[in-house]
Amino acid sequence: ADNRRPIWNLGHMVNAVKQIPTFLNDGANAIEADITFKGAVPTYSYHGTPCDFGRDCIRWEYFDVFLRTLREYTTPGNSKYREKFILFVLDLKTGSLNNHEVRKAGENVAKGLLENYWNNGNNGGRAYVVLSLPDIAHYEFIRTFKEVLKTAGHENLLDKVGYDLSGPYWPSLPSLDSVHEAFKKAGVDGHVWLSDGLTNWAKLGDMARLKEIIKSRDSENGFISKVYYWSVDKYSTTRTALDVGVDGIMTNYPYVIIDVLNENGYKDKYRLATYDDNPWETFKN
């Protein structure tokens, strides 16, 4: 058996459809997009300024068009299909929404995915989806999201969905206990991705938070399935992140991650994740 740790190589800030093949060609097996809301309505895949150094911050697409395009790349038999493209993270920009809007936003994102990505359950895209929310107080987004799929008779699609509650970042990050509490309130057991990171222009810290999350993931009663780190553009940082034990690395340069995964000392311990790797299972070696 192959007992190397599977790694998700996440293309960062992929918001225009033209960028999707570029990142996949560079070796990404997953992408992250920023979903911007007008009120409770997910409207664009768009980040805006400021963003990572060396990147165009204002590339965008309409949310429904973006999802339909993702579907093409992840539906076997489609001319655009890429077998290695196995997961995407929706970085949901719900920071300015009130509680009522957060609940509505959960419904709207579920409806959008159901119609435009899963094709109402009729041979839709097969990739796994991680819904990433910026505030643990927004756990009700997850509840209403799940409710919509259940009511529509597509509860099975929740097998493909994971969740990340990573903030707020200001004034200080929530404790892992309060993060766990929020997941319980959301009714989420398993299917948990947690992220930690810095913009690529920030000085690399001591990774204390990252190490704490990884320790929690690997503990006896850990609630975290996978841990990913962002945004990593350097060979040295990639090696450090892998050494610490991450499952995913979000990067502006996916080929850097591929290069490191092929290096001596790394290729015998890590490999690029494939569709057969369950993103909701904690890796045990």
From Swiss-Prot:
What biological-process GO terms show up in the record? killing of cells of another organism; lipid catabolic process
Per the record, the major location class is secreted
Q: Which organism is it from?
A: Loxosceles laeta
What are its cofactors? Mg(2+)
Disulfide bridge positions per record: 51-57
Give the matching CDD domains: GDPD_like_SMaseD_PLD
The record's listing under InterPro entries reads:
PLC-like_Pdiesterase_TIM-brl
Q: Which residues form the active site?
A: 12, 47
User: How cofactor binds (record note)?
Assistant: Binds 1 Mg(2+) ion per subunit.
Catalytic activity, EC:
4.6.1.-
Catalysed reaction(s) here are: an N-(acyl)-sphingosylphosphocholine = an N-(acyl)-sphingosyl-1,3-cyclic phosphate + choline; an N-(acyl)-sphingosylphosphoethanolamine = an N-(acyl)-sphingosyl-1,3-cyclic phosphate + ethanolamine; a 1-acyl-sn-glycero-3-phosphocholine = a 1-acyl-sn-glycero-2,3-cyclic phosphate + choline; a 1-acyl-sn-glycero-3-phosphoethanolamine = a 1-acyl-sn-glycero-2,3-cyclic phosphate + ethanolamine
Q: In which tissues is it expressed?
A: Expressed by the venom gland.
The entry marks the following residues as binding Mg(2+), namely 32, 34, 91
Q: What protein am I looking at?
A: Dermonecrotic toxin LlSicTox-alphaIII2
Q: What family is this protein classified in?
A: Belongs to the arthropod phospholipase D family. Class I subfamily.
